[in-house]
Amino acid sequence: MGNFKIYTSFKPKGDQPKAIKQLVEGIKKGYKHQVLLGVTGSGKTFTIANVIEKVNKPTLVIAHNKTLAAQLYGELKELFPYNAVEYYVSYYDYYQPEAYIPETDTYIEKDALINDDIDRMRHSATLSVLTRQDVIVVASVSCIYGIGSPDDYMSMHVTLEEGMKTERDAMLKKLVEILYIRAEEEFRRGAFRVRGDVVDIFASHCLDKAYRVEFFDDEIDAIYEIDPLTGSRQKRLQRIFIPPNSHWVTPEPRLKKALETIEEELQERIKYFKERGEELFAERIEKRTRFDMELLSQFGHCHGIENYSRHLSGRLPGEPPFTLIDYIYAGPSKGDFLTVIDESHVTVPQIGGMYEGDRSRKQTLVEYGFRLPSALDNRPLTFKEFEHRMNYVIYVSATPGDYEIEKSGGRIVEQIIRPTGLVDPKIEVRPATNQVEDLLEEIHKRVSRGERVLVTTITKKMAEDLTDYYTTVGIKAKYLHSDIDTLERVEILKDLRLGKFDVLIGVNLLREGLDLPEVSLVAIFDADKEGFLRSERSLIQTAGRASRNINGTVIFYADTVTDSMKKAIEETERRREIQMKYNKKNGISPETVKSKIKDILSSIYEKDYVTVDVVKEEAEEYELNEETIKKLEQEMKHAAENLEFEKAAEIRDKIFKIKEKMLKLGMKLTV
């Protein structure tokens, strides 16, 4: 069995040794759920790495977006250079799911651009968990989405050995069966090329190596690892393992059976539609399904093959799909593995929200004859199914949610001390009545020292107006909101760090992982307005944005002190005292964190499948109909009569948005 081994000159410091010891002991005692409550900058990843090394179990690390997953992957790969550290996220650079809009009779075909590097890494991840014990997979929510059967993936691989008796053409046929293609000109991953008795194979999990198999009559004479670009031999091998080029591979007998059961379901569905007089839907489902069946029978594959996964894997209706987690169970660990859920207060709700979002879209496709009902079984796991598959779990967060605290039975391991000595920012409460002018004075102080300021407001309108006002009085300010796309978000945050502007204003600056050491002041307007963005957890997370700077300060602008504010202040003060006591005892003088400007990319959120917005910047969309518009117009007039002009303007903007969406969907408007 392979053992995990960390290679680094760093040693655990501060709270890390205690946290590592407690978590390891908890696992040894059989505690299935534990919480690591670690503040920003306390080295939580290093702690988790040490736990992995000591418990020596295959580990699944789940992050709530691709970029944070990539950051964790990079850190763990550096710490474990001789173990298998893998990356498993959605392989789509662009993803438009298949959908149907009944109101306009609009069918949107699935459209996707697959990232070849990520596809390779997914193959590498599944192969590692199936064949190794010393494996860490850093994944996004993709790990609960359906892929093909691990048993089929393993049983259909091709193993080749020097001296093995096999015909060249028989081997080529096997490669085609597991979806490799012949490519003489463009030799790429998932392809093979033939030159007489020499066959080069570029396996699905390989990056910078390929294999050369040399035949003599009906025997493998030699096997080499080669450079795929130059074709030069690197080393001689005795044996190679070629996994399928897709996770959706099916043995021929099961494929034949699957086509029979698809036919049976198709006949039932045609009958269902005809009995209801829905001839168009009956014709549609027959035409579309028969086209796919023809491709499956000829090539073993078709566009949207995942929609037939229940038939292809032989599962019963309603049974959960195979996921990455099933591959872990099928490997050497047999399910004895560790799961680490990073930023659990965000990731846990996201995992829980995947199933319903996926089902509602597919339900419409089924109802209107675009897909068979069995397509609903190509889905992510429900939260209960996910829970059932977990073994040992560590939830990692600076502000763990109620679910994590309850599941752990209060077994919370704290990591409050930062090895750098940085102390949590001091929180001040000031009156909201003069917040704009008061903050202006504070901004001038920070700008004169070359520091930056973050400001959070209650509404987007207020963020925009505040930005305009500060700009007119000579402050270099910008605002950030949910309508700004990922790439522009990168640039804005990068420019803030570079000093191209000094003040960033927004509604939701709750970005766990935001690395902005130049920020010395976080101002929270209307901190006493209770709600998700002013909850205890949100206030602590937002305040944490100033924790990387030695001059870090937080100002709560409020006319009253809410329960959430009180708890956030008390918790921050508790953490400050622990850190200051440690600093005094060890003679540590804290310094502002120094990080390269390029690191800003690690803080940008990318969507993976349908990312659930746990933190919303505005209310859920209204229903798209004229009744809604009339109702909102009445509310707008009422607000104007009461001299609530800002509220009236917000309602007016919502009405414009609804009308714009209705027109885009081809819906009639008479108001």
Curated annotation (Swiss-Prot):
A Pfam family this chain is assigned to: UvrB
Keyword DNA repair: yes
Main location: cytoplasm
Residue ranges occupied by any UVR domain in the UniProt entry: 626-661
Residues in Helicase C-terminal domain copies: 435-601
Matches recorded under Gene3D superfamilies: P-loop containing nucleotide triphosphate hydrolases, UVR domain
Motif extent (Beta-hairpin): 91-114
Single Gene Ontology BP annotation: SOS response
Every Helicase ATP-binding domain range: 25-178
Any one Gene Ontology molecular-function term assigned to this protein's record: ATP binding
Oligomer status and interactors: Forms a heterotetramer with UvrA during the search for lesions. Interacts with UvrC in an incision complex.
Protein family membership: Belongs to the UvrB family.
Name of the protein this chain belongs to: UvrABC system protein B
Organism from which the protein derives: Thermodesulfovibrio yellowstonii (strain ATCC 51303 / DSM 11347 / YP87)
Gene: uvrB
